Amino acid sequence: MSRYTGPKIRIIRRLGELPALTTKKVKNNYPPGREWSTNEELSEYAIRLQEKQKIRFNYGINEKQLRRYVKKAKKSRGSTGSYLLNLLEMRLDNIVLRAGLAPTIAASRQLVSHKHIEVNNKIVNIPSFQCSIGDTIHVKKSNKSRQLIDLNSRRDTTKFFPKYLEVNKDNMGARVVKTMDKQDVNLTINELLVVEFYSRKG
């Protein structure tokens, strides 16, 4: 399954607020195709599927990527759900977004892919690159890159900076300073249901 490129508002109306997907706000809180809200009770499978889709769309990853992250998280020590979120939060495209350098995950991925971002003073153009504690992420020192980021930074890109990042707005960069906590995740999600979704699918 490839990444979704259709109307983002439809996704938000179906799944709820997804801060990384779009900066647009939803006027209607009912799912697309319905004229009013209902109290329809979702099945356990539907709830697990919904949580899985939240992660996919918010982090801008496809089904194959998410399945791979879950598989890797299951092999880790400690909480599988927490490790899954850590893998997602430490993606370079997500770090760029959470540092306020891009308005959406799609815009962040584009910045990385077009070689505007450096990690530890070296250009990295792989959005899925896993950042670690101590890594420094900066905008490339070129007029084109800096002007592009300056335009992005003037938008409402993020409501708060996660505690695992030390952000330097003036220098257009950030440093990973600690391990992620659940409170750092800018998304209402039950990650255990996502793990359970794939466990039941085998």
UniProtKB/Swiss-Prot annotation:
Subcellular location, principal? plastid
All residue ranges annotated as the S4 RNA-binding domain in the record: 90-152
* SMART domains linked to this entry: Ribosomal_S4, S4
Which superkingdom is the protein from? Eukaryota
Which Gene Ontology BP terms does the record give?
ribosomal small subunit biogenesis; translation
Q: Which GO terms describe its cellular component?
A: chloroplast; small ribosomal subunit
Any idea where this protein resides? Plastid, Chloroplast
Q: Which GO terms describe its molecular function?
A: rRNA binding; structural constituent of ribosome
Could you list this entry's UniProt keywords, alphabetically sorted: Chloroplast, Plastid, Ribonucleoprotein, Ribosomal protein, RNA-binding, rRNA-binding
- PROSITE patterns cross-referenced by the UniProt entry: RIBOSOMAL_S4 (PS00632), S4 (PS50889)
- UniProt cross-references to InterPro entries, sorted A to Z: Ribosomal_uS4 (IPR022801), Ribosomal_uS4_bac-type (IPR005709), Ribosomal_uS4_CS (IPR018079), Ribosomal_uS4_N (IPR001912), S4_RNA-bd (IPR002942), S4_RNA-bd_sf (IPR036986)
Q: Name one Pfam family in it.
A: S4
Signal peptide segment: none
* Similarity comment text for this entry: Belongs to the universal ribosomal protein uS4 family.
User: What is the recorded function of this protein according to its Swiss-Prot or TrEMBL entry?
Assistant: One of the primary rRNA binding proteins, it binds directly to 16S rRNA where it nucleates assembly of the body of the 30S subunit. With S5 and S12 plays an important role in translational accuracy.
Task: Tell me how this protein assembles.
Answer: Part of the 30S ribosomal subunit. Contacts protein S5. The interaction surface between S4 and S5 is involved in control of translational fidelity.
Q: What is this protein called?
A: Small ribosomal subunit protein uS4c-1
Q: Organism source for this protein? A: Cyanidium caldarium (Red alga)
